[in-house]
Regions:
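Conserved small/polar residues in nucleotide/adenosyl-binding loops
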Residues: 133-134
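A short beta-strand-loop structural module common to alpha/beta enzyme folds
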Residues: 58-73
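Short alpha-helical segments and helix-capping/turn motifs at coil-helix boundaries
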Residues: 22-23, 49, 72-81, 124-130
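N-terminal secretory targeting modules
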Residues: 1-38, 44-61
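Oxyanion-hole/transition-state-stabilizing segment in secreted/luminal serine hydrolases
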Residues: 76-124
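Short, solvent-exposed loop/turn segments at secondary-structure junctions
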Residues: 43-45, 70-71, 96-100
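Conserved aromatic-histidine-acidic binding/catalytic patches
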Residues: 35, 39-43, 112-119
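Glycine-rich, histidine-containing beta strand-loop boundary motifs that form or position
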Residues: 40, 66, 94-95
Length: 134
């Protein structure tokens, strides 16, 4: 679909996402079905709706699981019956700066920053590794 080719107009895509989806679903293409879990640290509705368009255009028809707002960590690390039943083929962890536990200050020393960064990477790696188990 031309509208989804680079360089694309993200404002147009957001405005016309429903009609673009109808066009893609109505084109008669055979698509591979996949289940995608989107574990979000922030609102993921727009991410999912746009991701769905690009995946449809690339030949994938996806069913999506969305974590509750800010629950990416809990869904990834702890057992979640709904997510377990969903059995995702793909897990996408959508986080932002707000989801970081460590926040250095201008007075933070190099060692403190290094330790904080390593702890943050360990935490995110744990979420990623455990999300793959579900």
């Amino acid at each position: 679909m031309k509208e989804l080719e680079y360089p694309f107009d993200n404002g147009f895509i957001m405005k016309k996402k429903r009609s673009l989806k109808r066009q893609l679903l109505g084109d008669g293409a055979v698509r591979l079905k996949k289940r995608v879990a989107v574990l979000g640290g922030s609102t993921t509705d727009d991410i999912v709706s746009v991701l769905e368009l690009f995946l449809l255009d690339m030949g994938f028809e996806c069913e999506f699981y969305r974590s509750e707002y800010g629950q990416f960590w809990q869904d990834a690390v702890f057992s979640n019956e709904e997510l377990d039943r969903f059995k995702p083929d793909i897990v996408y962890i959508h986080t932002s700066l707000r989801n970081l536990s460590f926040s250095p200050t201008p007075r933070s020393g190099e060692e403190e920053i290094e330790q904080g960064l390593n702890a943050e990477l360990d935490r995110l790696s744990q979420a990623w590794d455990l999300s793959l188990i579900h």
